[in-house]
């Protein structure tokens, strides 16, 4: 009887040790793309514009100034063509911070976003600079520019 209980206990311990790992927090190298960082918000903004069905996700991470601009173009294609002047069929988005400091403690940040993608079979590479403001605990996209 004692052997059966010992066997069941060992079996239960082994089964519980083989459970799923908890999901990783953040993304990128060393979790740099955690949701509290401006790089994460900048990538999320463009990801909603290029990989989502609508612009609602991009509007959620925008300041009121950017929200008005995005809403005036109604669709992802309109925003891509008129606001960003970059259309892609497929695109990869990579951030690069303009400061060496810790942006998550700042009130504003400037992030360079690099795009590499396809449009009608041609490969294009481009870059945009994004200015973000910290509103409460969240980063919001305020402006997108070429410079």
Indicate residue ranges for each PLM-predicted region:
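Exposed beta-sheet edge and beta->alpha loop/turn motif
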Residues: 99-147
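Structured segments of extracytoplasmic/periplasmic soluble domains
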Residues: 44-52, 61-69, 135-138
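Sec-dependent bacterial lipoprotein signal peptides
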Residues: 1-16
């Amino acid at each position: 009887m004692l052997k059966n209980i010992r066997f069941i206990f060992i079996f239960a311990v082994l089964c519980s040790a083989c459970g799923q790992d908890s999901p990783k927090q953040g993304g990128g190298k060393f979790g740099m793309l955690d949701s509290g960082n401006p790089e994460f918000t900048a990538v999320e903004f463009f990801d909603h514009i290029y990989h989502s069905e609508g612009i609602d996700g991009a509007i959620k991470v925008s300041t009121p100034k950017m929200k008005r601009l995005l809403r005036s173009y109604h669709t992802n294609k309109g925003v891509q063509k008129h606001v960003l002047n970059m259309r892609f069929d497929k695109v990869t988005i990579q951030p690069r911070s303009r400061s060496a400091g810790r942006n998550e403690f700042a009130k504003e940040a400037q992030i360079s976003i690099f795009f590499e993608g396809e449009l009608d079979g041609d490969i294009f590479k481009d870059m945009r600079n994004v200015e973000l403001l910290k509103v409460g605990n969240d980063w919001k996209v305020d402006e997108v520019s070429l410079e």
